[in-house]
Amino acid sequence: MNPERSEYIEIPVLPLRDVVIYPYMVIPLFVGRDKSIKCIEASMNKNKKIMLVTQKEAEIDEPTDNDLFTIGTTASILQMLKLPDGTVKVLVEGLQRAKVKKINNENGYFTAQIQLICTPEITEKEQSILIRTTLNQFENYVKFNKKISPEILNSLNNITNASQLSDMIAIHMPLKLSEKQSILETYNTNERLERLMAIMESEIDLLQVEKRIRNRVKKQMEKSQREYYLNEQMKAIQKELGEMDETLDEHEILKRKITTIKMPKEAQEKMASELHKLKMMSPMSAEATVVRSYIDWMIQIPWNIRSKVKKNLTQAQKILDSDHFGLDKVKERILEYLAVQSRINTVKGPILCLVGPPGVGKTSLGQSIARATGRKYIRMALGGIRDEAEIRGHRRTYIGSMPGKIIQKMAKVGVKNPLFLLDEIDKMSCDIRVDPASALLEVLDPEQNVAFNDHYLEVDYDLSNVMFIATSNSTNIPAPLLDRMEIIRISGYTEFEKLNIAKSYLKPKQIKRNALKSNELTIEDSVVTNIIRYYTREAGVRNLERELSKICRKCVKNLILNKSLKKIKITTDNLHDYLGIKKYDFGKTNYKNQIGQVIGLAWTEVGGELLTIEAACISGKGKLIYTGSLGEVMQESIQAALTVVRSQANKLGIKKNFYEKNDIHVHVPEGATPKDGPSAGIAMCTAIVSCLTGIPVKSDIAMTGEITLRGQILTIGGLKEKLLAAHRGGIKKVLIPYDNEKDLQEIPKTILKGLFVHPVKHIKEVLNLSLENTPYFSSK
């Protein structure tokens, strides 16, 4: 019997994606395509009947008749609702299977001529048997599949039509789209129910296997924690499928690695404990990841691996000389240090701390020492570190914990005796809550670092074989930390030293870096001297290197743009074409002789500096005003200087009561820069005397020294840096404390040759030498 009716019906067609509609099925549909919305509206305007056909490929947005299955379901639109976003929600009820004979696309939506499909009739007895058998099978299926509600079974028990029962069961079965369409295209009720029962039988078998796996896993879980359930279930599945590979146990590999590393006994016991703990854990657990990470760190750390240390001092001296010009005293101290270490075969001893302004070669000197000794070089920048955990590490109780920077660097370098450079040790941040400097005490103390304890490792690590060298711009370091280091000062370079450094190191380096050939660029020595004098004013050579780099870049540009240009020669005449106008004057000061203006000398982290000090006397009520971001010590120096002037007012020809009707204002320009220290005492006193007596101060004289209330001049620090600053600034005469005369032996002769340095004991000598006219008392 042919189930298809002979008559054709014209009806709108709605293409569906990823869903198959059966008869008796009530379902909401969301319609968004313009063509589909027109189809719904056309159906609503007629008899609310529509043909629902599924697309073969859901990804197609504009399907044709070839993209649709030929068998679908006629449906009745129960409800339609237009949504704010322009889409339409419709509630449809499947009515009857139908076959599409011809599709038209003339009115902006699909219509089709269809034939309704009638289900072949079966006897009442046969129908009763099929219903009972199918319901029993579905009930058995529901027992294993907990995702299907038992209430569905109750609703199916009331169905007396076998065809309707088959469609309702198909609705609730987790079938693929192709399987659902195949069941829709099965007209015969007997065949349809048989296919569904076969699918249910297959699903029941799979569910029974899954249940068997779960039961096996639960038995295995009795000896372990429930959190390992997922991993054990995976193992059981692999065992069921026969895909379990017999590979070398990971724990055995780790155990072999640990035995090959010669760890201290404490570390070996800790590793054995952690390995046993890892073995008892599931690899999928979070705790196992933490333990595995810990074991990996312990394996990476160099417990007994050393690099061979060179002990040839002659070779070490050659390396230091080839890498750095000058710095003779620094090199001598380093060679002494290396000589002692080579004899006692250990590095226990003072930790060297190279202190000097930026650009003088502190960091590169550390690299040279590493090369001279054959040690591997590792650098740790301490600038901005403000947490002790950066040094000691975090305890493993914290999520994402890691060893401190010390242990991390040791693991990276791979040997236990590298040269470890602690760069910018004075730039660490400290406050009342955190103090990383205290954590460094254990690292730098030779008596303690044999058992350095990182919070993450939880075992002691021997740092006694590491050669630590620190660098700093100043000695503003916590006293306990400073006490553990030997300070080696690296002062600024002289003009002669800068010239040689530029010729031997900086110029070849910049020519190579900017891809120039040696014969393409010539820079005369006089040009380098002019750059040092007129374009830089620094203790080191960093800005000098920048200016040379600027010349090289411009030369490369000119050579590329001008193909006929083969060589470039830089002379003093064309230097301004490359570097612009001169930034500084050399050999002359910037000031004329003025009343109340004195040039002092300061010593800062970046080297020596000229410090202009101004004083003015104005009508007032005896106030002392000081401005210019002055620190407490400098403010006290001003008060001491004023007291000296008041105590000797008669001798200076100043009225005794000058302070009653006058205010004295002392100012140090560049107010945004903080200034402090006692060494400007004599300069403050000279400026005050000058403004009160009206005698100008000589502009070619600079001075430095602390003053007492008796007018005595006390010693100061940083003499070499201050004299270098005076030389750079074109100062001819410098007044220094008498007790600092012995320090002149440390000053290069090239500097002393261009300066007249006059040691002074008392403020009388200072005033006689620095003022244009001799004060009243000096003639006595």
Swiss-Prot record:
Q: Name one GO biological process term.
A: protein quality control for misfolded or incompletely synthesized proteins
Top-level taxon: Bacteria
Q: GO CC annotation: what is one?
A: cytoplasm
Record-annotated Lon proteolytic domain positions: 592-773
What GO terms are given for molecular function?
A: ATP binding; ATP hydrolysis activity; ATP-dependent peptidase activity; sequence-specific DNA binding; serine-type endopeptidase activity
Q: Active site annotated at which positions? A: 679, 722
Report the principal subcellular site.
cytoplasm
Q: Which reaction does it catalyse?
A: Hydrolysis of proteins in presence of ATP
Q: Where in the cell is it found?
A: Cytoplasm
UniProt xrefs under SUPFAM superfamilies = P-loop containing nucleoside triphosphate hydrolases (SSF52540), PUA domain-like (SSF88697), Ribosomal protein S5 domain 2-like (SSF54211)
Q: Any idea where the Lon N-terminal domain is?
A: 11-204
The record's induction entry says: By heat shock.
Q: Which Pfam families does the entry link to?
A: AAA, Lon_C, Lon_lid, LON_substr_bdg
UniProt entry keywords in alphabetical sequence: ATP-binding, Cytoplasm, Hydrolase, Nucleotide-binding, Protease, Serine protease, Stress response
Write down the PROSITE patterns for this protein, in alphabetical order.
LON_N, LON_PROTEOLYTIC, LON_SER
The entry's ATP-binding residues are 356-363
Q: Might you give the EC number(s) for this enzyme?
A: 3.4.21.53
Question: What is its biological role?
Answer: ATP-dependent serine protease that mediates the selective degradation of mutant and abnormal proteins as well as certain short-lived regulatory proteins. Required for cellular homeostasis and for survival from DNA damage and developmental changes induced by stress. Degrades polypeptides processively to yield small peptide fragments that are 5 to 10 amino acids long. Binds to DNA in a double-stranded, site-specific manner.
Q: Which HAMAP family does this entry report, sorted A to Z? A: lon_bact (MF_01973)
How is this protein organized at the quaternary level?
A: Homohexamer. Organized in a ring with a central cavity.
Name the family the entry cites.
Answer: Belongs to the peptidase S16 family.
Name of the featured protein: Lon protease
From which source organism is this entry? Buchnera aphidicola subsp. Baizongia pistaciae (strain Bp)
The lineage, from the top, is: Bacteria, Pseudomonadati, Pseudomonadota, Gammaproteobacteria, Enterobacterales
